[in-house]
Amino acid sequence: MKKKVIRIILTSVLLLIAWLIDRNYNLPMWQTLIVYFVPYLLISYDVLGEAVEGIMEGNPFDEDLLMSIATIGAFIIGFLPNGEPEFLEGVFVMLFFQIGELFEHYAEDKTRDSISNLMDIRPDSANVIKKGEIIVTNPANVAIGETILVKPGEKIPLDGEIIEGNSSLNTVALTGESIPKDVTLGDNVVSGCVNISGLLKIKVSKTFNNSTASIILQLVEEASENKSKNESFIRRFAHIYTPIVVIAAIILAFIPPFFADSYNDALSTWLYRALTFLIVSCPCALVISIPLSFFCGIGGAGHIGILIKGGNYMEALARAKTIVFDKTGTLTRGVFEVEAIHPNQFSEQELLHLAAHVEQFSTHPIAIALRNAYKDTGCECKVENIKEFAGQGISAEINGKNVCVGNKKFMEHIGAEIVACSKCQHSKGTSVHVAIDGKYVGHIVIADQIKTDASSAIANLKKIGIEKTVMLTGDRKEVADVIANKLGIDEYYSELMPADKVEHVERLLHQKPIKSTLAFVGDGINDAPVLARADIGIAMGALGSDAAIEAANVVLMDDKPSKIAKSIAISRRTISIARQNAVFAIGIKVAVLILSTVGIATMGMAVFADVGVMVLAVLNATRALRVK
């Protein structure tokens, strides 16, 4: 770039000298040509070389050829009958073209630097502990199972498990979330997070290339390969358009003079118009700015933890009118908690005490919820003869009494009559019943908790024009009904098996509005068939999950459903910017093309319509990078 700046400055000085010589000395035409040809050759040798190279490779029709023909033609016009020398304009056009190229490359480089800074999540070194010593090395050299030390202020270089220490992590580079995440012994951590406070020893679980930060960066880099329809069309259009423009310019130069009184007298006039036509016809503003718009949009989204795998998926997301949610892990936290305790003859703590002790060895999510809720007071109970009844519950002997914990079917099986509870009529949870020696003593309500921003997420989707929201769940109808009504979801389908969810998505695909798309939102782990079948698959909570990143077209790195509306808004804004560039570039070019055909537009106006429009379009494209 520095070389080009020096060439532009030197050419400007030589052009000024050439103009002063031309103005003050009445030189013969060929001497004037030499005076102007020196700065022309200095500023255009690379463009001329690219044009020749394109011809040799069988791909001649690009902006280099158009500029070469136009500027060389400007030098030739002066030697035609009644032709006015256009040496100054020939050099000026190429000079301005190179200035435009300089601005374009500068804007593109700044954009790429901005995206690189936004996605600066991969550290360059790792502190490996070997034989009691700390060795600083490249993260790519660290093997699975080795121990690394991460000091406060450092980025975690590799995924792994904390084996010593506790701290708070800044995950903003991965998720866009500014609130620190507390971690301690036994927690899994991912690369790219910044260690804020404590000293951490981490046992590496993934190689550098397979760690989260590397996968995310690879995903962003590969996104440019998945072209949108607009990008693909523009590239095909340029290949067809440029040869047509060259043919049209040839016709414009040589056919109209036949209708003049003197062909030779009119040729120079129409040749000038044709050369102006060639300059303004260059499609570089479209070819450069539209892909750059998508590139910036994808980079900006990545900064706040929304990974869109390409311009084609961005276009599909922008046209979404139907959003289908899996319930667990998407609208709800996917973590069961004790919501209520309804004893018949014991205290709440005593009932919970019995249930937690019976379930103490179970790995079922409900058992874990009971144990988490129970505050052990140090009471020692003798728990014996634990028996599990598949799909029903568990029984055990506690201090000589038979305690059964399970569902309604289990109570019927042991002959315990359930006492109706008016408090549970509108509960969204699952009732865990408890009986002692065959007598019903109460129940505990376990519920999956709705995410704090789920309600606002649905409301925001409706605000941006989503016409239908649907929830699919394997849970009971009563639970699904409560959640759907609370969140304002339009339709819900409950008690579904995985295959049923695919069938429902198939049906909804046939019902969606014409030219719109259907997006399915899931956790990306158990929903792979549905994610694949939807027009656009969105995986939530994918931080540290390779399966989620692989399965979806759009990946939300945290658990916030509110980012679904944000991802759609970013996609729509990006496409709007790309369309603005297309309309602006085509509009200006068409206007100047018409003016050049009728002889009003000069080469200077043509250069602005080409290079000036390109620079403005590139600057406009960079707006897609700024995501609020």
Tell what function each PLM region has:
Residues 151, 338, 342-468, 477, ...:
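P-type ATPase nucleotide-binding
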Residues 52-61, 103-117, 292-311, 622-628:
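Juxtamembrane helix-loop transition segments at the membrane interface in multi-pass membrane proteins
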Residues 1-10, 241:
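N-terminal membrane topogenic signal
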Residues 12-13, 232-261, 273-294, 579-608:
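Bilayer-spanning, highly hydrophobic alpha-helical transmembrane segments
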Residues 18-32:
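Short, hydrophobic transmembrane alpha-helix segments
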Residues 19-22, 36-125, 129, 141-148, ...:
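Actuator/coupling domain of P-type ATPases
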Residues 400, 430, 436-580, 588:
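Conserved ATP-binding TGD loop and adjacent catalytic N/P-domain core of P-type ATPases
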Residues 63-68, 174, 272, 282-358, ...:
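Conserved catalytic phosphorylation-site environment of P-type ATPases
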